[in-house]
Amino acid sequence: MTQKEKNETCIHVTVSGKVQGVFFRESVRKKAEELQLTGWVKNLSHGDVELVACGERDSIMILTEWLWEGPPQAAVSNVNWEEIVVEDYSDFRVR
């Protein structure tokens, strides 16, 4: 395992609050691309947003902190995340 591989991780996240209809997914995509992360983000039927993000641990931590703020119109009440097995995505997509 290379040093780069040791420094990479993936997380599965659920974000709750006023996070739909406020450009949350597009804002997550832009932030993830800025941080050179890969993965996806999508709305859930009950109003939360779900995402998987993969990349360097430092960038993942920056994203998890940013998720508490989100775009200006959002009102985040909870960010629940867990590390998962590293997956190989080529980019970051809105689903």
Swiss-Prot record:
Its EC number is 3.6.1.7. The keyword Membrane does not apply. Gene3D superfamilies: 3.30.70.100. The active site is at residues 25, 43. InterPro entries: Acylphosphatase, Acylphosphatase-like_dom, Acylphosphatase-like_dom_sf, Acylphosphatase_CS. The keyword Hydrolase applies. It catalyses: an acyl phosphate + H2O = a carboxylate + phosphate + H(+). Pfam families: Acylphosphatase. Signal peptide: none annotated. One of its GO terms (molecular function) is acylphosphatase activity. SUPFAM superfamilies: Acylphosphatase/BLUF domain-like. It is an enzyme of class 3 (hydrolase). Belongs to the acylphosphatase family. This is Acylphosphatase. It comes from Coxiella burnetii (strain RSA 493 / Nine Mile phase I).
